[in-house]
Amino acid sequence: MTQYDPTNSRPVIALMTDFGIGDGDVGVMKGVIASITPDVHIIDITHHVAPQNVPSGAWILASAYRYFPKNTVYVCVVDPGVGSSRRAIALHAGDWFFVGPDNGLFSYILAEQPVRATVLLSNPTYHLPHVSSTFHGRDIFAPVGAHLARGLTRTFAELGTSIDPATLQRLEIALTSRRGTDIDAHIVHVDNFGNLITSIPSDMVPELFTAPQVQIIFPQQGVVVEKRRRFFAEGHEDGQAFIYSDSSGYIGIAVRNGNAARTLGVGVGAAITLVTAAK
């Protein structure tokens, strides 16, 4: 039997945008990529990030990137600042490469992976000949991603000027901070079911289901959630919110057979405090 040889595998580009699929923008980006690197395997993470919602896009990327092969190139476009002074960047972090705007979209990557190199995409050789002020996904990010998938580390240094990763934009919403046993964080994503995803990694609270009492408090809304469930079917009280560990690896809040965002009246950006205490 022929054994799989990962060194002979096709290059992989993963796309994530807020473009939707009603227009031709996603198809055009794929066409640009295929024109440069015809053998590339293009995988869509999603094209339905809420429009201009950088925090949601950052979280979706964070929940997905670990499940792709090493050396995958992520081309990510949630870019409300396109055409402005915001920087176009590529970074080599962990075992993967990321291409997109410097607007906080890579906040979780920067927090979770060692950054090996970062470049400003200043070399026009790797762009399309004519760069629009409104479609950098087509004119800069797609061609850069395609060239990068062909050459990876060899090409990376040629993409532009090296920049200090400490200068990259990071979303405050993606940060967590401890105060004793309390954790201050935010809601960073609302999924299709209305579940509220927090910026707190589940492994940050190993006692989530063993501590005598755990609460998530929304101080601005005066809302407290303290029921905990290991899985959705265990949440037998329809209409009541409970805390759970989401499959993405982050702590979430759900309502069985309901919508937590609507039930609690909160959404992306809401401040929370997770409190662990003995009764």
Task: Tell what function each PLM region has.
Residues 128-209:
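Anionic-ligand-binding alpha/beta catalytic cores of soluble enzymes and soluble regulatory domains
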Residues 2-6, 10-51:
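N-terminal glycine-rich anion-binding loop in soluble enzyme alpha/beta folds
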